[in-house]
Amino acid sequence: NSRDLCMIEHIPELVKAGISSFKIEGRAKSAYYTAVTTNAYRHAVDDYFANTENFVLKPWIKEELDKISHREYNTGFYFNHEPGQVTGNGGYIRHYDAVAVCEKSIDDSTSIISQRNKFYVGDTLDVLPPSGIPFLTKCLSLENKDGIMVESAPHPTERLTMKSDHVIPQSSVIRKKK
């Protein structure tokens, strides 16, 4: 199949059908993919059980799944309104890069991060905290391990001190729109 299964918009139907747990399908999914997908489905399921009668999927939850590398989404064989198997262009859609992980929050604006992909001072970054709702922040400055201010983070796994305009919780994934 050249598309990826996405059932986030059908949580009520799945729960009513007796499904009580969800599994991430596919081989070699990254930690970033797993974190984003787990966070989205966890919020969707919790929101559904908090308000089963008037459940509406919050737009940010579905938007999260567009921030991971994926092929075009469909619902597979679950419903009859589209083909369950599609054999066409199976190209991947990639709108975001995971650029860092927050190792430690020092204060309201300073974090120790481990770089994953290149980004620059001044970039708007999208933060996925370990729990809670993702938020945007701006990279105000970067300092390398020698205390030298740098304009970019070009070296994978480099530890940097980053100042931003928000507190970034420890273990947050920091990403950037391409």
Sequence positions of predicted segments:
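Surface-exposed amphipathic alpha-helical tracts and adjacent flexible/coil segments at the periphery
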Residues: 1-178
